[in-house]
Amino acid sequence: MTRTILALFTAAALGACASKPATNEVQADLPVAKESARAGAGNNVSMRGNPVPLGGSGVVEVGKPLPAAKVIGTDLKPVDLGATTGKVRIISVVPSLDTPTCDKQTHELSEKNGGLDSSVEMITVSRDLPFAQKRFAREAKIGNVTFLSDYNMREFGDANGLTIEPLALLARAVIVVDKDNIVRYVQVVPEVTALPDMQAAMQVARGLL
């Protein structure tokens, strides 16, 4: 029974959303969330209306440093996302790149950033294998986004409170970090099958330059 429920949740989480909540605006047949859930253990997101718990030992919060977390690049080298880079960063968090909603979110980051990619570091984090991320970037012709994987140590989801507990996938979110590694914007999408408001995140990032 548990396996069946998880399979249904996975299908709901990774597919495009058929329903369009009244609080969302629609973008290319996918709803765009205007509200945010709270990250961290004890909080929930939903999958087509079904609540699922978030877990983690920490939580990402506006006004605080982005938690230290090692992820893996497409070159298989570790990267500490909590390290100060001296650049403004937009971190787009997706459950899996091989799905319509995640695909749309990543293309918007890459192609509809209004030139921010010349001065802001664009990052996508998922628990896809680095090989799958590299293939996605190549096939999508995306060269201005850094793809990082949380598949191995799973530190990013744990440190930021963004792990969907029943599935061990990352919740859908977008985070803006300033040049000093302080979180300036967080949106955790309440309904995983909806898109985050990427334009709102980009507006915040633009104001930090």
What are these regions (language model features)?
Residues 2-9, 13-68, 72:
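N-terminal targeting signals for export/organelle localization
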Residues 65, 88, 169-171:
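Short, small/polar residue-rich loop motifs at catalytic or cofactor-binding pockets
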Residues 79-109, 121:
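Short active-site neighborhood of thiol/selenol oxidoreductases, capturing the structured segment around
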Residues 103-142, 147, 155-156:
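Structural microenvironment flanking redox-active thiols in thiol-disulfide oxidoreductases
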Residues 171-209:
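Thiol-/selenol-based redox modules, centered on thioredoxin-like
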